[in-house]
């Protein structure tokens, strides 16, 4: 690695749209079916309160109650269980190439972490679904901190959890504003749009050696 390329001792991953694929269309249909809602109305209600759910100022029952109220629908216990299950399924189609890469980094002795805007029920669901989540050296789940990306404090928390200065961490996220926030706290960062573009930028930035890591 060239001396002009920062030394990277940890890779910090966003969860949704990086370690997992785009939302599963069948799960959107499951969610809409609970309320017998049209697509536009459901999406408006779903996203209206999502930031508060991710941040932890709304817990799962409170979030779905807000969605139900916006749609003028009741929220029965059976419906709540189905909504939580379908919402977990929506965001848990693994991006296997990135999951495998994270495992390779871990085996090579490079720290790996997750920094995700993640609500409470979703964290439980992904940990129940994916055993590999526990292999990460540190997890930063937004709902536990009452913070969310792109706030600087959540990036600092992730760096502290990994035990490294931000400059030694490469952060990967699908959203530009989150990438900019990571850079502002001193991290290296790459926006993930698709895997070919990601590999190309890794090589262009001088981080290509990390794509096939060797034990340290």
Which role does the model predict for each range below?
Residues 111-113:
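Structured, non-catalytic alpha/beta "coupling" segments that mediate domain-domain communication
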Residues 108-109, 135:
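Structured helix-beta-strand junction loops
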Residues 70, 89, 104, 161-163, ...:
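Acidic/proline-rich low-complexity IDRs
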Residues 2-9, 13, 115, 119-216:
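Asp-based, Mg2+/Mn2+-dependent phosphohydrolase catalytic module
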Residues 4-100, 107-108, 119-122:
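N-terminal helical cap/lid subdomain that shapes the substrate entry/recognition surface
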Residues 100-103, 107, 160, 180:
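Surface-exposed alpha-helical segments enriched in charged/polar residues
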Residues 35-36, 72, 109, 163, ...:
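Glycine-centered loop/turn motif at secondary-structure junctions
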């Amino acid at each position: 690695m060239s001396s002009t390329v920062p030394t990277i001792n940890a890779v910090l991953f966003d969860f949704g749209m990086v370690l997992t694929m785009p939302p599963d269309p069948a799960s959107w249909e499951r969610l809409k079916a609970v309320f017998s809602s049209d697509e536009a109305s459901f999406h408006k209600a779903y996203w209206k309160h999502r930031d508060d759910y991710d941040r932890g100022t709304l817990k799962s029952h409170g979030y779905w109650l807000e969605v139900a109220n916006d749609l003028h629908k009741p929220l029965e216990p059976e419906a709540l269980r189905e909504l939580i299950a379908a919402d977990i399924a929506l965001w848990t189609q693994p991006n296997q190439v990135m999951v495998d890469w994270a495992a390779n980094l871990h085996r090579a002795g490079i720290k790996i972490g997750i920094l995700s805007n993640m609500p409470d029920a979703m964290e439980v669901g992904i940990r129940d679904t994916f055993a590999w989540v526990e292999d990460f050296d540190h997890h930063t789940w937004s709902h536990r901190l009452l913070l969310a990306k792109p706030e600087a404090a959540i990036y600092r928390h992730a760096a502290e959890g990994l035990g490294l200065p931000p400059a030694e961490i490469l952060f990967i996220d699908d959203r530009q504003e989150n990438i900019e926030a990571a850079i502002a706290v001193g991290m290296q960062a790459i926006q993930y749009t698709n895997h070919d573009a990601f590999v190309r930028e890794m090589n262009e930035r001088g981080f290509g050696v990390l794509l096939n890591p060797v034990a340290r």
